[in-house]
Amino acid sequence: SPVTIWGRTSRERIERILGDAVRPCTADQLADLAADDTVVIFRGDYLYDDRLVSHLAATANLLLQLDAPPHPAVAAHVPAALAAEALALVDGAAADATLPGVERSTPNTITLAFQKKLRKSEPPFVLPITAQGSRALEQRLFDWSYKGVTDLVTKWAWPVPARRVVALAVRWRLTPNQVTLAGLVLVCIAGACFSAGLYGVGLAAGWLMTFLDTVDGKLARVTRTSSRPGHYFDH
């Protein structure tokens, strides 16, 4: 699907989640795969929970179907020998096809409820992407990016303004590290202001820094833009 969610298509988001763990290929390249290769297939018109993408890539012989009837297949991880059949099944061209030795699961039957990095429990999701529903999907992904355990200001005061600033950052192609750098500058300004006795200005700079600390994390999660240096920079 060409529809973007927070500036990323479904394919771009999946590729960022998996990184170097997989080698992207098209349907035309399936015939070139080695016999011992495995293939991970995703429909490009769905938004996938990050945990499902990672789990599917790490679990061979698995077909992911939606929970709602008629339980269409939306993703699969199969041996190369079954790639063509799995592709037809996920594409909807062969709804009744069977894949020998492949387990069928749905988001609700896969136990991935605990998201360690975000310190919260939430069922994994697979949602259809449409142009009309893109704003709702962006809100869903933004809400999902919040930690279950956080401070009261971050939980209740920052979400609405943070979402607007994240949207501006995506539009202006700002990176999370650039937002973090702006927060670091504000820390220095706050320290200088407190040293000079300008407590009001220093306090304002400090609060703005805490706001940007929320923004950079949300921007990183909704756009899947992160790096190890950036992780340490943020902390």
What are these regions (language model features)?
Residues V39, D45:
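Short aromatic/hydrophobic "clamp" motif used to bind/position activated sugar donors
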Residues S1-L30:
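N-terminal glycine-rich phosphate-binding loop and ensuing alpha1 helix
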Residues A204-H235:
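Acidic (Asp/Glu-rich) catalytic motifs at the cytosolic membrane interface
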Residues A35, L47-E122:
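Conserved core of the sugar-phosphate nucleotidyltransferase
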Residues C25-T26, R171, R221-V222:
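Transmembrane helix-loop junction
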Residues Q29-T38:
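Active-site nucleotide-sugar/metal-binding loop of Leloir-type enzymes
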Residues K120-A204, F211:
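Topogenic membrane-insertion module of multi-pass membrane proteins
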